[in-house]
From Swiss-Prot:
It comes from Klebsiella pneumoniae subsp. pneumoniae (strain ATCC 700721 / MGH 78578). This is Glycogen synthase. It is an enzyme of class 2 (transferase). Belongs to the glycosyltransferase 1 family. Bacterial/plant glycogen synthase subfamily. GO terms for cellular component: cytosol. Disulfide bonds: none annotated. The gene is glgA.
Amino acid sequence: MQVLHVCSEMFPLLKTGGLADVIGALPAAQIAEGIDTRVLLPAFPDIRRGVVDAQVVTRRDTFAGRITLLYGHFNGVGIYLIDAPHLYDRPGSPYHDTNQHAYPDNVLRFALLGWVGSEMASGLDPFWRPDVVHAHDWHAGLTPAYLAARGRPAKSVFTVHNLAYQGMFYSWHMNDIELPWSFYNMHGLEFNGQISFLKAGLYYADHITAVSPTYAREITEPQYAYGMEGLLRQRHHEGRLSGILNGVDDGIWSPQNDLLLPMRYDRDTLEEKAENKRQLQIAMGLKVDDKAPLFAVVSRLTSQKGLDLVLEALPGLLEQGGQLALLGAGDPVLQEGFLAAAAEHPGKVGVQIGYHEAFSHRIMGGADVILVPSRFEPCGLTQLYGLKYGTLPLVRRTGGLADTVADSSLENLADGLATGFVFEDSNALSLLRAIRRAFVLWSRPSLWRYVQRQAMNMDFSWQVAANSYRELYQRLM
């Protein structure tokens, strides 16, 4: 079976979010399962530099200008690159300029990605043709539409990593992207009077997956679906919508092998984690105190991630003797709020604005609790890293957080199921109650250690996900 992933980023070449982590790990896991898997990406500068052995496959004139299709390898995975410097050779973010304005030609930049994905199924590379084209998020959303226009030369899967980003463009762009105008209607890619790349993926794909079973259910409800609930409910009834949990890349996230940690450890040597905590406290300007539970945030600072709740609950957390270490960037109001809290509580709150992959490992290896209080969370990887590192996740019961973390309730403790702390309602009071439960467990060190071991025992490997995708592909064939 031959599978092509169509997407816009891939860790470690280029990463703006969790999508990159998935594409950095899933194809390799699928290859290990015996599936001939390749990836198609735009040749953004960082990606182009990383695929050093890229050779020309073909050149084409397209609606978006002249392109060269390249093929090379990265970490044992075959990578196709769409080399179109006039579209992709820009510094910084792949999606917007330095002023955070979306590039005005994004409609062409990402329509081209979908078009090439579809053409691959029609022999664009004469030596390799996919049986399944697997597109990810709105950037690749037109892939299933182009396949439909082509008479469906391959089966298509569309994975929703985050339904909030919809890829909306003015309707007149139908003239620019070489899709029939008949596709522009309610039963197609029209949404609120515009073209939606996301809806194109949802409507035309043979099967839709969400990145967790709970998120797959949630997106059939209005509060999570951003207006797509009718279509998603229909796909659910047709058996064409399912949830497959993301995994964790053991090669990158594993406390016993993590070279970014001052001290490596596993579930049988958890006492070594204390040195990581000490070094993290020093690095973040916190008081070195092994008795104070160290809560951490590694996140984009947005209201989706519920970080306003952390700011609101922070006085209660500090009053009980806790510390906070935060690494993240985003909403300027939240950034200012956390910086002000750090200034007001020296030695108790440490804040680093920005994102540093290496430092996120040090936080995961040194903190006691990782906070993930999201309003919605399709899958979430942060809590999975927390589980792997024995850094107990404190999460809201939504999306993938609900599927992966079991609350340390008395029943779950008795049944050996507890792996963290879970709260229900998206408000500071509910969050504070979960924080209180964390303090109570912290006061019982042997019980805390027991829950850490439970957490580290969970299996969220990519092999599990790769197997689930293989079963899905086989059903479609």
